[in-house]
UniProtKB/Swiss-Prot annotation:
Record-stated family: Belongs to the acyl carrier protein (ACP) family.
Keywords: Cyanelle, Fatty acid biosynthesis, Fatty acid metabolism, Lipid biosynthesis, Lipid metabolism, Phosphopantetheine, Phosphoprotein, Plastid
Record pathway: Lipid metabolism; fatty acid biosynthesis
Gene that specifies this protein: acpP
Purpose of the protein: Carrier of the growing fatty acid chain in fatty acid biosynthesis.
MF-aspect GO terms: acyl carrier activity
Ranges for domain Carrier: 14-89
List of residues that carry O-(pantetheine 4'-phosphoryl)serine: S49
Location in the cell: Plastid, Cyanelle
Source organism of the structure: Cyanophora paradoxa
Main location: plastid
InterPro entries xref list: ACP (IPR003231), ACP-like_sf (IPR036736), PP-bd_ACP (IPR009081)
Protein name: Acyl carrier protein
Any single GO CC term annotated in Swiss-Prot or TrEMBL for this entry: cyanelle
Post-translational modification: 4'-phosphopantetheine is transferred from CoA to a specific serine of apo-ACP by AcpS. This modification is essential for activity because fatty acids are bound in thioester linkage to the sulfhydryl of the prosthetic group.
């Protein structure tokens, strides 16, 4: 992977991370400063199934994707969830999608 590809990947991850964190903060009433990527989704953030359904719905609408609910159960940390969301975006829209879209 070239340096420019790595930079674009980091930029894309930052875009997705910021949006996912904004959605989380709104849904579970937490301050963004309290979040870090190592937090466990269920244990640390205390996200229940109803919260998760709403969070996924908002992410799907924001990025025009469909998240495979069955795979969410295997994600532990916020970073794993963000990485999975980014992969799902790339699979549906390609690598240029986030660079060409205004969020």
């Amino acid at each position: 992977m070239s340096l420019s590809e790595q930079a674009i990947l980091e930029q894309d991850k930052n875009i997705v991370s910021n949006i996912v964190q904004d959605i989380l903060c709104e849904q579970i009433s937490i301050e963004k400063t309290e979040l870090n990527l190592d937090l466990y989704i269920y244990e640390d953030l205390k996200i229940d199934s109803l919260d998760l359904v709403e969070i996924i719905k908002q992410i799907e609408e924001k990025f025009d994707i469909k998240i495979d609910d069955s795979k969410i159960l295997y994600m532990n940390t916020l970073e794993e969830f963000i990485d999975f969301t980014l992969q799902t975006i790339y699979m549906k829209h390609g690598f240029e999608y986030l660079q060409n879209k205004q969020f």
